[in-house]
Amino acid sequence: MLKYQLKNENGWMHRRLVRRKSDMERGEIWLVSLDPTAGHEQQGTRPVLIVTPAAFNRVTRLPVVVPVTSGGNFARTAGFAVSLDGVGIRTTGVVRCDQPRTIDMKARGGKRLERVPETIMNEVLGRLSTILT
């Protein structure tokens, strides 16, 4: 967030928070190129879900993301996937919680698409917690 002050016609100071185009928040889906990759990593230009909080992303400019795919059969059967179908957003497929990675969104030409519902974000964080702890 970018802070700035404004004076109104009476000379009063007001602070406003303005969201910068590059701000990245937990729960947002961005379209980004994941190439180059190696092995079984998700590749190509695809949606990713940001899982790190905005404060972390502002400081590091390197969010941790998980890819969204229309495939992911292994992740589905192993319980690592969270479905986005029928949750009221345009992006469809499954979130691959088994493939978190840190990316430089700016260098990869990332573009903000939309935000997932809080229930989906909580489910993704729960799956990540199970995998990482």
UniProtKB/Swiss-Prot annotation:
Keyword RNA-binding: yes
UniProt enzyme class: hydrolase
Entry EC number(s): 3.1.-.-
The keyword Cell division appears for this protein: no
Alphabetized GO MF terms: DNA binding; RNA binding; RNA endonuclease activity
InterPro entries linked to this entry: PemK-like (IPR003477), Plasmid_toxin/cell-grow_inhib (IPR011067)
Keywords: DNA-binding, Endonuclease, Hydrolase, Nuclease, Plasmid, RNA-binding, Toxin-antitoxin system
Pfam families: PemK_toxin
GO biological processes: mRNA catabolic process; rRNA catabolic process
Protein family according to the UniProt entry: Belongs to the PemK/MazF family.
Described purpose of this protein according to its UniProt entry: Toxic component of a type II toxin-antitoxin (TA) system. Probably functions as an endoribonuclease. Responsible for the stable maintenance of the plasmid during cell division by postsegregational killing of plasmid-less daughter cells. Neutralized by coexpression with cognate antitoxin PemI. Both PemI and PemK proteins bind to the promoter region of the pem operon to autoregulate their synthesis.
Subunit structure: Homodimer.
Protein known as: Endoribonuclease PemK
Organism: Escherichia coli
Organismal lineage: Bacteria, Pseudomonadati, Pseudomonadota, Gammaproteobacteria, Enterobacterales
Gene that encodes the chain: pemK
